[in-house]
Amino acid sequence: MIQMQTILDVADNSGARRVMCIKVLGGSKRRYASVGDIIKVAVKDAAPRGRVKKGDVYNAVVVRTAKGVRRPDGALIKFDNNAAVLLNNKLEPLGTRIFGPVTRELRTERFMKIVSLAPEVL
């Protein structure tokens, strides 16, 4: 469950290390984002010589949450951290690699590229 001001780890090699959610996209009163939702983020910590720099604003898709995601069979998939993958304006991933596992809920038309790059899909 991601809301405004939430700090997330970045699960790609775009150069950002940590980002902060500044808006949950999808409706004017929308408060929370979960796995697979698109959020607007500001880069808070970036690696030197990376593709992004501190202060940049990007779209991102949430790939892991500590709150978890409930499956129709009743299983609950939780993670140790909240993580996101940075996206460009066409909603394509900025990085060329994905670090850590992602959930099967990302297997939609929009995020198949992220699923194919991920080392593990839960």
Curated annotation (Swiss-Prot):
It comes from the Bacteria. One of its GO terms (biological process) is translation. Keywords: Ribonucleoprotein, Ribosomal protein, RNA-binding, rRNA-binding. One of its GO terms (cellular component) is cytosolic large ribosomal subunit. Pfam families: Ribosomal_L14 (PF00238). Gene3D superfamilies: Ribosomal protein L14 (2.40.150.20). InterPro entries: Ribosomal_uL14, Ribosomal_uL14_bac-type, Ribosomal_uL14_CS, Ribosomal_uL14_sf. One of its GO terms (molecular function) is structural constituent of ribosome. Present in outer membrane vesicle formulations which are used as vaccines in human. PANTHER family: 50S/60S RIBOSOMAL PROTEIN L14/L23, LARGE RIBOSOMAL SUBUNIT PROTEIN UL14M. Binds to 23S rRNA. Forms part of two intersubunit bridges in the 70S ribosome. NCBIfam families: rplN_bact (TIGR01067). Belongs to the universal ribosomal protein uL14 family. Part of the 50S ribosomal subunit. Forms a cluster with proteins L3 and L19. In the 70S ribosome, L14 and L19 interact and together make contacts with the 16S rRNA in bridges B5 and B8. This is Large ribosomal subunit protein uL14.
